[in-house]
Amino acid sequence: MDKRIERRAFLKGSALALGSVAVGDWGGARAAAATSEDKSQVFFTRDISGDGLLRIYSKINAGMTGKVAIKLHTGEPHGPNILPREMVKALQQHIPNSNLVETNTLYKAKRYTTADHRETLKTNGWDFCPVDIMDEDGAVMIPVKGGKHFQEISVGKHMLDYDSMVVLTHFKGHLMGGFGGSLKNIGIGCADGANGKKMVHAAPDDDNYASWLKGEPFMENMVESAKATIDHFGNRIVYINVLRNMSVDCDCAGVSAAPVKARDLGILASTDILAVDQASIDMVYKLPETELHDLQERIESRKGLRQLSYMKEMKMGNDQYELITV
């Protein structure tokens, strides 16, 4: 039987668990009163396995039709924290007419060129189905509706070949974004390596990463980029966050990722991108201080919570949700 809890009650429990951990400037902690009709549904399971993933996907898959892209961060070579291959394989084989999709990177590493990227895919075990590197044949511009930074954004050309998208995300920290949830997975991950990622990062034509855009302006760029993908798919896009092996570093870091200090929490899923990322943050912020500290420092020092508040401003979803355990 589904077990339901509204966000206000969840956050009350979170505050008790946090104790003395400071969250004073965390906008997400302000839960307004609302009726259940005002809330988005977020589904949760503690079962981080193929079975758990299939069970939670069944709660959100009503809009999935036609050719389905499974957007996954496939990681740098030998990354210790990437999602388990067998779990991802179980989902992909369950979804008809589906395959994994990725894009090349802006930074010069083992996923910078399509040839190197394909070798990395083999190294990391992503060989149980086709993996479409969406910018292999170039990019296209798609509109950003209501953006204040962009009117359009460059994405991998092959994205237009798909009818639906499942955003399957390893939720964790991120060097520049503070945290990497569903928003980051498509805001950066669907932008092509040659142009779109450069637009989001406001990166000059050099390898001086220190000069790339940071803080709230970067979060806003990332949100607007993601909005373009969401608007493109309409009601045929869903979001799954796996809260497992949550290093402060993204899977971009590969073997250099910082050690994991936080426990695994489970899988969250929704048809609402803001709700699923908000619920993920709320759940992480409920961790004991010893497990939360490094993640919280990474998130807040990078102004990562601006991802959530700007998604709300852009009317991309609801930060009030009903958490349903399945």
Whereabouts are the PLM-identified features?
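N-terminal secretory signal peptides and thylakoid transit peptides that target proteins
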Residues: M1-L18
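Extended, low-polarity segments enriched in aliphatic/aromatic residues
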Residues: T35-V326
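Hydrophobic membrane-targeting alpha-helices
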Residues: A22-G27
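Signal peptide processing junction and immediate N-terminal pro/mature segment
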Residues: G28-A33
